[in-house]
Amino acid sequence: MHMNLEAFILGCGGMVPLPHRHLTSVLLRREGELFLFDAGEGTQVSLRRLSLRWKKISAIFISHTHADHITGLPGLLMLSSQVARSEPLYIIGPPRTAEYVETSRRILDMYINYEIIVKEVIEPQVVYRGKDFQVRCFCLDHTKPCMGYTLEEQDRPGSFDPRAAQDLHVPCGALWSQLQSGVAVQSAQGVTVYPEQVMGPARPGRKVSFVTDTKYLQSIAAEVRNSDFFVCEGMFEKGMEKDAAEKKHMTCVQAATIARDARVRLMALIHYSPRYTDHELKRLLKEAQRVFPHTILSRDQLMVPIAYRE
């Protein structure tokens, strides 16, 4: 079964917002269900501009509790009370995420008419499970506890071989559908036919990874390996490795090195330093593309469709 999967860049900036560059936030839409990664200032604005239905947000994944990644969260929580919402909202993040949510609710005297479930994490683990996918967190190295995330789908069934089914005397119709659903059937001759007899090898699902803020770590490549879409901070240009390491951030070339080593399909740089104009960001893009050609620049309201690997 084909399921649509799209990524929306709601904010691509780091540290401070700019008129054309909201703070970091990325949203994934999978068959109508929404998952938000960070909620920087301006997240609501991009949601509205893209006509995304915020009440469909099932979970929010927070990388860390620096202001440029969470200041958009209180507004989202209040906004969700303005629409009919019956499902709980999950918020996953490092230590102090729950404190931030509870303090915001108390100080702002929020009216919340739905359940909020906060889970704090400090070590790699699966933090959210769907019917056929999961979200996993892993540790980064920043100035305070920080997590990266991957959303990974289960493998899909292989391609159905109608000729094999015919050779096994399985009549076309409902029985073919059952085989494709993983259910054994009886042939016209009364013989049990198993799905593996008519289905090709399993096909991989899709994987999306989100990494910011962190200094360069070789271990990140293993976590994001084979991602179909990799969103990674590229805060500084080549030559600023020392400054980046001191501030526990990465350069665009370091991000590209991870993408290359992890064999991802496409990487989008994000969390740019406000020192760079849009024109100057093109220089960072070229530097990254010399290491990993399949690199693009994030920009606010960018939508990236994520196709299956066939």
From Swiss-Prot:
The reaction(s) this protein catalyses: Endonucleolytic cleavage of RNA, removing extra 3' nucleotides from tRNA precursor, generating 3' termini of tRNAs. A 3'-hydroxy group is left at the tRNA terminus and a 5'-phosphoryl group is left at the trailer molecule
Keyword terms: Endonuclease, Hydrolase, Metal-binding, Nuclease, tRNA processing, Zinc
EC number, as in UniProt: 3.1.26.11
Superkingdom, natural source: Bacteria
Role description: Zinc phosphodiesterase, which displays some tRNA 3'-processing endonuclease activity. Probably involved in tRNA maturation, by removing a 3'-trailer from precursor tRNA.
Oligomer and partners: Homodimer.
Protein name (record): Ribonuclease Z
Provenance organism: Treponema pallidum (strain Nichols)
